[in-house]
Amino acid sequence: MQAEELKYLPHEAVIKKVAPLATLDNVVSGIPAAITLAQFIIESFWGRSPLASASNNCFGMKKNLSGNNWPGSTWTGKSMTWVSSEASSGETVRQPSEFRVYASVEDSITDHSAYLAGAMNGTDLRYKGLRWQLDYRTAAQIIKDGGYATAPDYVEVLCAMIERYNLTQYNVAQPPFLVRVTVPMVAARKGPGSEHPATVVVRGPNVFTITEVQGSYGRLKSGAVAALQRVNPHAKQRADAQ
């Protein structure tokens, strides 16, 4: 998705398009979807800000952050100069900074969550305790204390946005376990059974996946979902999303 696609949509329509991305990211990264959505709305002004439109950077992510050493980043190294407002000594000043450029909104969300989950401050996580934190006020305070934003009322603004649009409904609770299947080869087919043609084949050491590719179906997915459902009847939706 390109941020430009959101430019003229009403607020509810923006949430409808972005919320599934935030929820899926929540499953993978552990960053609450409510926090992702609220920051998306505030930092990109509903995806309409000039920076978001020009770069798909929907969270104000600057070029250099915490040594750029967190795992899972989707940033390719491309950046652009943009003038932004920063709070300094009680005043708001405008100054040029280098901001990250992304290929899509999805990449922006993934990099933002990877940063929140893995950025370091010395030997400690900068946002320690944020992953799977379902108390949104606690989560917002962790983000503020970690130095994400300079605005003194950032926590209040973030929480107000979450409450106004009931964004906690998109959160995913921490799963009790992770299913990981390691195999030498995976073939996703158009239906269950080897008589159906394969749509994609992945080979190599330590290939692991529960996958659905363009409507395809694989034995690993089928078996893993069935096994997972026996111990957790509500797990199918999460497994299908992987």
Predicted regions mapped to residue ranges:
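Catalytic cores of secreted/periplasmic lytic hydrolases that degrade extracellular macromolecules
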Residues: 1-178
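Hydrophobic residues in beta-strands and at strand termini
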Residues: 61, 181-182, 210, 220
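The feature marks long, low-complexity, polar/acidic/proline-rich intrinsically disordered regions embedded
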Residues: 193-195
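Core beta-strand residues in small-molecule sensory/regulatory alpha/beta domains
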Residues: 189-191
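Cell-envelope/ECM-targeting effectors and their regulatory/trafficking segments
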Residues: 173-177, 182, 222, 239-242
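Residue "hotspots" at secondary-structure boundaries inside conserved domains
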Residues: 100, 197-200
